Amino acid sequence: MDNSIHVKREIQLPSTSPAGFPGRESVTVVDLCSSDDDSDIGEVAGGLEKVGNNFVGLKRGRDTFGGSSEVDRNNVKKVTTLAELGVGLPEGFGQSNPPESLTHPIPANPCNVFRPVPPPPPPPYAGTSGKIGGCKQFWKAGDYEGAAGDNWDLSSGGFDHVRVHPKFLHSNATSHKWALGAFAELLDNALDEVASGATYVKVDMLENNKGGNRMLLIEDNGGGMDPEKMRQCMSLGYSAKSKLANTIGQYGNGFKTSTMRLGADVIVFSRCPGKDGKSSTQSIGLLSYTFLRSTGKEDIVVPMLDYERRDPEWSKIIRSSTRDWDKNVETIIQWSPFSSEEDLLHQFDLMKDRGTRIIIYNLWEDDQGMLELDFDADPYDIQLRGVNREERNIKMASQFPNSRHFLTYKHSLRSYVSILYLRIPPGFRIILRGIDVEHHSVVNDMMQTEQITYRPQSESYGVVTNMSAIVIIGFVKDAKHHVDVQGFNVYHKNRLIKPFWRIWNATGSDGRGVIGVLEANFVEPAHDKQGFERTTVLARLESRLVQMQKTYWSTNCHKIGYAPRRREKSAYGYDNRDSSPENDREGPSSIKTPTPASDKFYSSSYPNHNGDNGVSGKDGARLQEELRREKERRKALEVEVQLSRQKIEEMKKEQENLIEIFSEERDRRDGEEEVLRNKLEEASNTIDDLLNKIKKMEGSKVPSWRH
């Protein structure tokens, strides 16, 4: 008897079935499931396949597209005879099976393959139609009902897999309310490749040869992805960057959210040079929302192709079977902008020996049926249509060049990318539609700058932190024109998270023109990297930034043409408002001198110098002159007092700031002392224990005497 393991394959019979074998209407697959425990007879019997007079326990795998696979040779269990099982079969058992002449044994393949499901009729290429599964607007693309799925019997070792419906791709991408934020995610991935030798990232517009539609290209010449990393990139939650100190990625979700926010489909080409004696590889992956919706898939499946360099040619890496390979090729060609495998491989010729090339197509449209991305307004830029684009701001940007980034970053990718990173690695280029993006530091747009060091307070005394943030605050150079430009650019690990964060929403003109820059690595960015997680640390930072802006504004606003801030009135009637601009809302500028009771007295005493009740002659003139001098002296004293009070208030503010800083330093020092004290106490206890052990050891020694 042949010792090789074979699995029966059932074939479709003609409508005229032999006696005892009913006809079937479609191709069938034996759906096998077994436990990993060989001792469990019930589970073994449930996964048996008859081979001759023996039964083979088989384990079902899952193929690339979510279906059942054929038998995996590595998972074939031991051959079990009926005698070993102690099972007696009734007479005529198995009579309903097809005759042996119609059953052909095939060798079990070592990898997963597809279920033999009849393929649906090929729909027209989605890029040529006016709709994608019913809608091309991003915010409405999730409004569809897929086929009701009831096939939940697939399991692994008795545990059910959590299934991910294709609609999750859309709902996951809604975290990006702002489309330009999705570009930033892809640029982050390219910038992280600097460690692998990347020197550029290119963002451009391409035209689809199939439908003539426009597509997005993001390409870098970094280290690329091998087949394993490509699969992690297409999966959810895999992130090797979360453990790296200088990278911002941590959720393993940015590629999926960003690409699906910009378009319905994305195809990725990546070439990875060989390392540690391994051959070079190149991979193609297709993540297509259009494909998943149009074919009624209930799980996210990703067609992929892998190649390996075997000099001088590239050879296919067949992970399961040739049939699977052909199925992946057909699917990618049908649902991608390319018409043949040769066209697919030509994309690797454009990236030379390494790198990653991402093409996003079936771009989303707005309510008017136009692309959400505007490629025509500027041939060297990619801009947004809709509410983020304000013609008034565009006109003001040409008048006030130092405020240009504040006025245009919401709709212009070139403007946003120029301030996206606090520092650009030397020699690294960001190329947007053929022209390099010029890196811009917002500090260059500022005047009368001040530098303040902010140290966050530690959450617990047991944790000592050396984190701090240097805040550079000042007026924008266009502030003298009283443009409403204000806010802080807050970076995290070199990446802009909050552009021009407006934290002081004062009425009137208070706070105008004040901008700042800081890098806060002690706060955690949110899921979309367009904000921070609301924590106590962030609340303290926000409160401190508000205080900085108020103090800077009240101290320096008169230098750019605004009125000096008024003070609270004291018990003596003087105007002595607090220096906080909250107490002053766009009013008269100078210090007002109240009219004291003495003025009213003299005015009533001398209503008319020539009247009957007035004082005439030399005495009257002398009194008038003395009165005038007293008034001038009083006014001068009031001004001096007011200036002195203003200086006192400013000194009070400075003193409060110093007290707060000293308090934070004291708390930090106390925490450090407590930690050191505990460590010293532990060390002392350890020493005492060691001494006691030494004494016990010495005492336990029995002296030996020679007789």
Curated annotation (Swiss-Prot):
GO terms for cellular component: nuclear body; nucleoplasm; nucleus. Its cofactor is Mg(2+); Mn(2+). Its EC number is 3.6.-.-. Disruption phenotype: The double mutant atmorc4 atmorc7 exhibits a pathogen response phenotype with abnormal up-regulation of several genes involved in plant defense. It is an enzyme of class 3 (hydrolase). Its main location: nucleus. GO terms for biological process: defense response; DNA repair; gene silencing by siRNA-directed DNA methylation; positive regulation of defense response to oomycetes; regulation of DNA repair; regulation of gene silencing by regulatory ncRNA. SUPFAM superfamilies: ATPase domain of HSP90 chaperone/DNA topoisomerase II/histidine kinase (SSF55874). Residues 620-701 form a coiled coil. Keywords: ATP-binding, Chromatin regulator, Coiled coil, DNA damage, DNA repair, DNA-binding, Endonuclease, Hydrolase, Kinase, Nuclease, Nucleotide-binding, Nucleus, Plant defense, RNA-binding, RNA-mediated gene silencing, Transferase. It is found in: Nucleus. A motif (Nuclear localization signal) lies at residues 633-640. Residues 1-22, 568-619 are annotated as: Disordered. Belongs to the MORC ATPase protein family. Exhibits ATPase activity. Binds DNA/RNA in a non-specific manner and exhibits endonuclease activity. Probably involved in DNA repair. Involved in RNA-directed DNA methylation (RdDM) as a component of the RdDM machinery and required for gene silencing. May also be involved in the regulation of chromatin architecture to maintain gene silencing. Together with MORC4, acts to suppress a wide set of non-methylated protein-coding genes, especially involved in pathogen response. Positive regulators of defense against the oomycete Hyaloperonospora arabidopsidis (Hpa). This is Protein MICRORCHIDIA 7. It comes from Arabidopsis thaliana. The lineage of its organism: Eukaryota, Viridiplantae, Streptophyta, Embryophyta, Tracheophyta. The gene is MORC7.
